Amino acid sequence: APQFVGGLCQDGSGFLYLCSGDKVYRCDQKGVLTVYSEGTYDEPMIAPNYPVFDENGGLYVSDSGGWGDDNGKIFKILPGGETQLWSDTPKEFPNGLCISPDGSYLYVVVSLNSPRVERIPIDPEGSAGIRELVVEIPNSVPDGLAFDSEGNLYISCYRPDSIFRFNDDQGLETVVHDYEGTMMAAPTNIAFCGDRLNDLLSSNLGRWHITRYDIDACGHPLNYPIVE
């Protein structure tokens, strides 16, 4: 990629979609990159951060904007590359994304002012509803999201070195915390991997490595649509 790569995802044909610089790229099986989206004419992308597919091939992309500039937004890229400004909020550095297990909400990490997770209803026609607060995470910089098969939401935090689990009944609980910052070291995105989706992995920006966590949980399967 031409610049630092933020988040990435894969479609059902094996193409990769990655956020780099001010664009979203599509990468084929030979490693050839093409520009998939630069935003819209009126709203060009500034700092696309993380992409996630819905089941129909719509690609939601958080554009974090500038750190502390409160100019973030969320784009939706339709199959083929046509791009819409899907939501102009949250503005305070929208970061990691995930689709709810039933496909009815887009969950969004908001890293700043104040750090939290929100969700935005996905209306039947695909437009954005009114955003809702899910949970606040004081004194942190949340970054990544993932659901497990039981509907629990996992939230990785760049600061401090922690992963939290949230559900409506038990609230927010700490799953992993590394006060030394050695095994985790500024975790960013997280994902459930493996044949049974029972390996939780985090990418760690602080020491440029990947950490595996044995947490006795399996991930909810992601969407891998065929995108023409």
Residue ranges: model-predicted function:
Residues 23-25, 72-75, 116-118, 162-164, ...:
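A short loop-to-beta-strand structural motif that recurs across blades of beta-propeller domains
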Residues 1-22, 41-59, 66, 71, ...:
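Beta-rich, blade/repeat-based domains predominating
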Residues 122-188:
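Glycine/small-residue-rich hydrophobic helix-like segments
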Residues 30-32, 79-82, 124, 160, ...:
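Short coil turn/linker residues within repeat-based beta-strand modules
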Residues 179-180, 194-196, 204-209, 215-219:
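A short, acidic, flexible beta-alpha connecting loop/helix-capping segment that sits on the rim
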Residues 1, 33-42, 82-88, 130-136, ...:
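A short beta-strand motif characteristic of beta-propeller blades
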Residues 119-126, 214-222:
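Short loop/turn segments immediately following beta-strands, especially the blade-tip
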